[in-house]
Amino acid sequence: MGLERVVVIGLGVSGRSIAHFLAQKGVCVLGVDKSLHALQNCPYIQEKYLENEEFPSQVDYVVRSPGVSKEHPWVQAAIASHIPVMADIQLAFQTEKFTERESLAITGTTGKTTTILFLEYLFKRSGIPAFAMGNVGIPILDGMQNPGVRIVEISSFQLADQEKSYPVLSGGMILNISDNHLDYHGNFSEYFQAKQNLALCMRNPDDLWVGDERFYGHLYLEEVQKYMRLLDKESALKPLYLHDKYNYCCAYLLAKTEFPISETSFIEAVATFNKPPHRMEYLGQKQGIHYINDSKATTVSATETALLGVGNQAIVILGGRNKGCTFSSLLPALRKAAKSVVAMGECAQEIARDLEEFPVTVVKNLSEALLCAEEQAVPGDVIVLSPACASFDQFRSYEERGAMFKQLVGMEEVLL
């Protein structure tokens, strides 16, 4: 690569992957993290810095972990010194490997992971080797070594640094966009531009499918609606939430741009696919009260979508850490689907203010929220955890929050 001293900011899962990749290239890796433990447990770095130390000299470029803000003092120091800053996807896209075979990428506000995992499943079930990577769990610099079609989930955090064109993707899709991560990007315009930057990664920009006419690319709505009508005709299929059908059809559209996968194969894949947990996950019922774990709903728009599928007797648990959104836009969906809201966590009072026209009870944490919801519930009601917030006020991840909810729900007796 010709560059010798590279700073890696943030040494979590992605940061360790970045450091490992660079070390294999013979680069001198300078690691920075707020945690001394993280620095001591990363064997790929030659120089270790806590983030409150001064930015080092003679740095060729900086690679930040996806969760590291562009406002991080070391990122700002690099920008002030005209040192290039990038994320792991830019590092990956500069390698020759990404032009060797088909590589697809998906971004959007909601539905990315389900769409990515279904696309991988559809390919494999059709006899086509494929591997999902990126924001879906396996860092891109690790996953790109695997054979088959690359299917990359990309977040706005990773696309925020995309200033140059790296035309490596044979297909791509921007599923949708609504207010999200405004605490990170500063405003909707910056968030929108980060998503649009996916176009800079296309081998042919005309091969980018988009779900919003504000984006540059081919609008996919007509094609997706055609495949949704196809699924609606299949009475043998298990009941599907509308947003799940939508995601599956988006995946099929992207798959068909690369390979001639039949409609029969698509329908069979839909019938046998197991959706990842914490996404409108039905847990069962006890004493006539139903429970749904939708901990992955970390945005207002995701919770709005969830409310479309819960009937009209829901008690909704909201709250956590706000990502820069207002909650008042939930009111129309709540009026149709819910009887009350239980607000918890860091922004509980903010939720209560935004939803002052609706019955809201404020509690401290998830345990109290579930107890409060159960006190209000009668047989036939649905208690749904769909927080519309990040989990980081009280949990390490939405997965941990969802697992706690499942544990709390199942504590008294086995669900039917």
Curated annotation (Swiss-Prot):
Reactions mediated catalytically: UDP-N-acetyl-alpha-D-muramoyl-L-alanine + D-glutamate + ATP = UDP-N-acetyl-alpha-D-muramoyl-L-alanyl-D-glutamate + ADP + phosphate + H(+)
Keywords recorded for this protein, A-Z: ATP-binding, Cell cycle, Cell division, Cell shape, Cell wall biogenesis/degradation, Cytoplasm, Ligase, Nucleotide-binding, Peptidoglycan synthesis
Subcellular localization(s) per the UniProt record: Cytoplasm
UniProt cross-references to Pfam families, sorted A to Z: Mur_ligase_C, Mur_ligase_M, MurD-like_N
One cellular-component annotation, GO: cytoplasm
Positions annotated to bind ATP: 108-114
Pathway(s) it belongs to: Cell wall biogenesis; peptidoglycan biosynthesis
Family membership: Belongs to the MurCDEF family.
Protein's job: Cell wall formation. Catalyzes the addition of glutamate to the nucleotide precursor UDP-N-acetylmuramoyl-L-alanine (UMA).
Protein name according to UniProt: UDP-N-acetylmuramoylalanine--D-glutamate ligase
Organism: Chlamydia trachomatis serovar D (strain ATCC VR-885 / DSM 19411 / UW-3/Cx)
Lineage: Bacteria, Pseudomonadati, Chlamydiota, Chlamydiia, Chlamydiales
Name of the gene this protein is made from: murD
